[in-house]
């Protein structure tokens, strides 16, 4: 491994660990550490690129005893072992300086499997786990995984047949526990799955919980933009300052599900919806992510990054860097011990 690159990844990992649970008296030190990591990232990024922090990738091993609940054979090309060796070199070549993993499985022990899988690899700096919010074992499971500082939050598969937000007493207890620990909540909100009105109710009920809506908030192409979707997006962004939007999985706008389908690679196919998200949430609340390897069902990793870079370029390097890496470093960290 190139020594300077290894130093970069170690610096970023150290920065995130230092930021996690940082007491107020040490805020200045945290800021200095973050600035140093950003500077080193910029120095070591491949020529002609700016740094990227990846916030949404998945690993799984279908060949393990018992397999995995998802993907299934129906997902075709991604129903195979997907491990760090499949991703790391490709990501580095595309300017990714650090990556966060999102757990795709609802099996509690699979959270530990991921943490163990990348324990010795500082390139993978944070992990969004998967626990059933509202489950009787939630508090115990969260306390267990919270001992690992890389465990920064939870993916929002919530109790109920539709994995929906009910704000039941059990869910509220779990969500407040998450907020109390300074962790984050990733949510899918599209169609009947966690409708925007329910996300708004959640953000109001737990205002100190940082929430991020994955994959463009369920945007669907082509233009013109659906008026109801736009209204709901703008209302949510306005009412809920604790809600962020993941600028991720662009190809979903056209794909009919997790099946092989060639989505467009031209910015023009996405720009109208991107504009809604940018004007609603602003550059401070958009966070890049890919949804690799799922995106490979519909297009290439490189092309998706190119779409993002092309869209952000006219807005200047400050906006680009916020969306593509700086916002991620601020959002995906533990704000309390």
Sequence positions of predicted segments:
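Short glycine/proline- and charge-enriched loop/turn segments
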Residues: 67-75, 260, 302-308
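Catalytic pocket-lining loop regions of alpha/beta-barrel enzymes
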Residues: 31, 152, 165-287, 336
């Amino acid at each position: 491994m190139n020594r300077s690159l290894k130093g970069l990844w170690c610096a970023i990992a150290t920065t995130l660990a230092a930021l996690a649970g940082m007491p107020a008296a040490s805020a200045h030190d945290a800021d200095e550490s973050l600035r140093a990591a950003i500077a080193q990232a910029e120095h070591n990024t491949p020529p002609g690129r700016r740094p990227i922090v990846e916030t949404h990738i998945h690993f799984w091993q279908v060949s393990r005893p018992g397999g995995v609940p998802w993907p299934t054979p129906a997902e075709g090309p991604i129903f195979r072992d997907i491990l760090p060796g499949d991703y790391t070199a490709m990501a580095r070549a595309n300017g990714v300086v650090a990556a966060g993993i999102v757990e795709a499985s609802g099996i509690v022990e699979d959270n530990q499997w991921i943490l163990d899988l990348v324990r010795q690899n500082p390139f993978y700096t944070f992990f969004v786990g998967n626990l059933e919010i509202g489950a009787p074992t939630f508090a115990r499971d969260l306390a267990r995984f919270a001992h690992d500082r890389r465990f920064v939050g939870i993916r929002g598969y919530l109790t109920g047949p539709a994995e929906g937000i009910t704000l039941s007493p059990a869910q509220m207890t779990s969500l407040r526990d998450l907020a109390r620990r300074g962790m984050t909540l990733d949510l899918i909100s599209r169609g009947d799955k966690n409708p925007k009105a329910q996300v708004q109710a959640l953000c109001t009920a737990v205002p100190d919980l940082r929430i991020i809506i994955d994959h463009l908030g369920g945007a669907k192409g082509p233009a013109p933009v659906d008026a109801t979707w736009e209204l709901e997006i703008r209302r949510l962004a306005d009412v809920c300052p604790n809600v962020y939007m993941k600028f991720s999985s662009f190809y979903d706008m056209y794909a009919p599900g997790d099946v092989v389908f060639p989505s467009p690679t031209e910015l023009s196919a996405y720009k109208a919806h991107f504009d809604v998200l940018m004007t609603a949430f602003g550059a401070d609340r958009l966070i890049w992510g890919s949804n690799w390897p799922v995106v490979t069902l519909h297009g290439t990793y490189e092309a998706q990054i190119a779409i993002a870079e092309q869209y952000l370029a006219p807005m200047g390097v400050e906006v680009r860097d916020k969306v593509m890496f700086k916002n991620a470093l601020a959002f995906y960290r533990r704000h309390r011990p």
